[in-house]
């Protein structure tokens, strides 16, 4: 390897790749992958840079997936050092993307370099799926690559996404799935009138309140071995004209389900509508299914990750499905086994985002050890 994981991470962190820009990150990575025999394919869409790089043509196919884009920096004067000028202070590397998730991308590349050097004739194939559209709308990123791979009948046997999954120390948590996300905009209709004469109208906020209370108190399911119970939360309520003397004619309530495999989107929609009907509301709902839940149970990939973390970090990892959605929701459609394994998440998206320097070689070693268990004869 010409660079350590730290040096490669610093090079791509220095690229100001605010979503949906790649800002040269993938060019740096391609420089490292081509000498290893990776074929390079861009599956770009609507200005988004998407890379599919593959070494080998046979099964099993092991993929490292991730993103090179980062969230905006926020106020530059709040940063202790410039966000795109990576700096080490007291054993910690600072810069936008250090945790989410350029360090993981660098670690996956150096892990593959080391693995291929030691196992040049390894069975199966290795690949990288990288996008510059994960932190934004994600309409033209990983999903575009998945659609292209699906169209030509490709299936991923194993996939690791380098999202920052650890909580307190590297390796203490691995995501083996994610909950689904189902959002809705509920419009409850009333009759606008002068607030001094409420009998001449119908206040939709008052009418909706009992139903909302019941929805908030409903147990949607009890979860299961891998998932916490489904939750329902209101995110926004808007009603009225802004005047203090007008009963509003309607109220809009935005809400979200984070749901487990113990429920289905269709079942949740039906149950919610039944509660609204019980309260005799005049309403409309617009639904958006953001993601279905996905899960990798115990098996070769989870066992390999558990072993690797035990050997490298000296701890037992926890398999978890908590947290928000990720690009795994797209990859799951064509992947048999998938995990998210990455650094501590505490500073992701924050001012002075950072990662412990000693976590970088360890993360690379974890990735390499997983490859050694699954991709050697």
Swiss-Prot record:
Top-level taxon in the UniProt lineage: Bacteria
InterPro entries the UniProt entry points to: ArgE/DapE_CS, Bact_exopeptidase_dim_dom, DapE_proteobac, Peptidase_M20, Peptidase_M20_dimer, Peptidase_M20A
Enzyme Commission number(s) from the entry: 3.5.1.18
Keyword list, A-Z: Amino-acid biosynthesis, Cobalt, Diaminopimelate biosynthesis, Hydrolase, Lysine biosynthesis, Metal-binding, Zinc
Cofactor field: Zn(2+); Co(2+)
CDD domains: M20_DapE_proteobac
Keyword DNA-binding: no
Listed pathway(s): Amino-acid biosynthesis; L-lysine biosynthesis via DAP pathway; LL-2,6-diaminopimelate from (S)-tetrahydrodipicolinate (succinylase route): step 3/3
MF-aspect GO terms: acetylornithine deacetylase activity; cobalt ion binding; succinyl-diaminopimelate desuccinylase activity; zinc ion binding
Gene Ontology BP, a term: L-arginine biosynthetic process
Pfam families, A to Z: M20_dimer (PF07687), Peptidase_M20 (PF01546)
Matching Gene3D superfamilies: Zn peptidases (3.40.630.10)
Presence of keyword Metal-binding: yes
Residues annotated as binding Zn(2+) 1: 67, 100, 163
Record's subunit section: Homodimer.
Annotated function: Catalyzes the hydrolysis of N-succinyl-L,L-diaminopimelic acid (SDAP), forming succinate and LL-2,6-diaminopimelate (DAP), an intermediate involved in the bacterial biosynthesis of lysine and meso-diaminopimelic acid, an essential component of bacterial cell walls.
Protein name listed in UniProt: Succinyl-diaminopimelate desuccinylase
Source organism of this protein record: Dechloromonas aromatica (strain RCB)
Lineage: Bacteria, Pseudomonadati, Pseudomonadota, Betaproteobacteria, Rhodocyclales
């Amino acid at each position: 390897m010409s660079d350590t994981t730290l040096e490669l991470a610093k090079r791509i962190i220095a690229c100001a790749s605010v979503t949906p820009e790649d800002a040269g990150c993938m060019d740096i990575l391609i420089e490292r992958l081509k000498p290893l025999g990776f074929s390079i394919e861009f599956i770009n869409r609507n200005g988004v840079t998407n890379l599919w790089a593959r070494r080998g043509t046979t099964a099993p196919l092991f993929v490292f997936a991730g993103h090179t884009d980062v969230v905006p920096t926020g106020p530059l004067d709040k940063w202790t050092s410039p966000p795109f000028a990576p700096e080490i202070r007291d054993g910690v590397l600072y810069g936008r993307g250090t945790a989410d998730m350029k360090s993981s991308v660098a670690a996956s590349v150096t892990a593959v370099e080391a693995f291929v050097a030691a196992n040049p004739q390894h069975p199966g194939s290795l690949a990288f799926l990288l996008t510059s559209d994960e932190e934004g709308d994600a309409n033209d990123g990983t999903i575009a690559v998945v659609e292209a791979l699906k169209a030509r009948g490709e299936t991923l046997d194993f996939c690791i996404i380098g999202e920052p999954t650890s909580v307190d120390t590297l390796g203490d948590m691995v995501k083996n799935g994610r909950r689904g996300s189902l959002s809705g905009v509920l419009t409850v209709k009333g009759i606008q009138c002068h607030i001094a004469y409420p009998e001449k109208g119908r206040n939709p906020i008052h009418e909706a309140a009992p139903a909302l209370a019941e929805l908030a108190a409903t147990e949607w399911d009890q979860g299961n071995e891998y998932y916490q119970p489904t939750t329902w939360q209101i995110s926004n309520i808007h009603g009225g004209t802004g005047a203090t003397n007008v009963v509003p004619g309607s109220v809009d309530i935005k809400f979200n389900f984070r749901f487990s495999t113990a429920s289905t989107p269709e079942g949740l929609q039906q149950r919610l509508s039944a509660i609204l009907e019980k309260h005799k509301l005049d309403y409309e709902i617009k639904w958006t299914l953001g993601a279905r839940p996905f899960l990798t149970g115990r098996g070769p990939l989870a066992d390999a990750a558990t072993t690797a973390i035990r050997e490298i970090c000296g701890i037992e990892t926890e398999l978890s499905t908590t947290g928000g959605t990720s690009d795994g929701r797209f990859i799951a459609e064509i992947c048999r086994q998938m995990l998210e394994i990455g650094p501590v998440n505490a500073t992701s998206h924050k001012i002075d985002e950072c990662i412990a320097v000693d976590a970088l070689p360890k993360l690379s070693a974890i990735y390499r050890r997983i490859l050694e268990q699954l991709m050697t004869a």
